[in-house]
């Protein structure tokens, strides 16, 4: 402390008291495969604890302790911690808080950043097709229908929310993993696009080819006419 005096009184100047630790820099965005970092200033040399918080005001993950009056801290995230962060992120991206406590969690400093999911597309395990009204093992034009049964798996805690099949004047989209066409009107190698969408909005697609044999139902052609006694057509004098 310093004192000074004059005829008008005296001045008392207090020394600067170090306060909380602060985050001074951090990446504006990072991927789920990255190790995030931040720079900090800790003029009071307090004890510190940092954390990652998807969806701010939620649970704290990847807690670490650190020390020093300034520096850069980088997480070395474990596979379990990455799994926790991914499952907490409900979209293709989400807000994640980089937080820093100091002085036994008395003060907090934080930056809210963008967390980006990568390689999170669902997997189509199989697309099974069944021929309804076949001829033997053949899928026949104008006779047979095709039933699609789709098996797919979402990643990192997401769920499959939509199944879709389209092609050759057929279209289906819905929450059920099965659908069926009406009678197939075309023949040849018909291609159908199968798409699944998960709860984060990620999609995966595949092409399914169905071989359809050309077929038309038989027709009967009839003609009526006059004939003579020998059965020969005679439109003028036949009976």
Residue ranges with predicted function:
Residues 15-23, 116-128, 211-220:
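Extracellular interdomain linker/stem segments of modular secreted and single-pass surface proteins
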Residues 25-33, 131-145, 226-238:
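Short, solvent-exposed loop/linker segments at the N-terminal edge
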Residues 38-45, 144-157, 239:
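Acidic, Ser/Thr
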Residues 63-69, 168-177:
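Short beta-strand segments within Ig-like beta-sandwich modules, predominantly Fibronectin type-III
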């Amino acid at each position: 402390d310093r004192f000074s005096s004059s005829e008008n009184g005296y001045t008392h100047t207090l020394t600067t008291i170090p306060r909380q630790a602060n985050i001074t820099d951090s990446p504006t965005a990072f991927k789920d495969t990255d190790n995030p970092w931040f720079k900090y200033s800790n003029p009071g040399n307090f004890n510190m604890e940092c954390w990652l918080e998807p969806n701010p005001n939620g649970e704290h993950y990847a807690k670490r302790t650190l020390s020093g009056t300034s520096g850069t801290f980088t997480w070395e995230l474990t596979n379990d911690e990455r799994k926790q962060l991914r499952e907490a992120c409900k979209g293709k991206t989400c807000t994640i808080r980089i937080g820093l406590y100091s002085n036994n969690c008395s003060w907090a400093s934080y930056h809210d950043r963008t967390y980006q999911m990568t390689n999170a597309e669902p997997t189509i395990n199989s697309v099974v097709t069944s021929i309804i009204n076949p001829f033997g093992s053949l899928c026949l034009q104008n006779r047979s229908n095709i039933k699609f049964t789709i098996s797919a798996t979402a990643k990192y805690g997401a769920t499959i929310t939509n199944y879709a099949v389209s092609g050759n004047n057929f279209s289906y989209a819905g929450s059920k993993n099965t659908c069926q066409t009406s009678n197939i009107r075309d023949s040849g190698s018909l291609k159908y696009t199968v798409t699944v969408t998960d709860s984060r909005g990620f999609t995966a697609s595949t092409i399914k080819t169905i071989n359809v044999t050309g077929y038309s139902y038989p027709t009967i052609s009839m003609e009526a006419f006059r004939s003579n006694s020998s059965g020969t057509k005679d439109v003028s004098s036949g009976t």
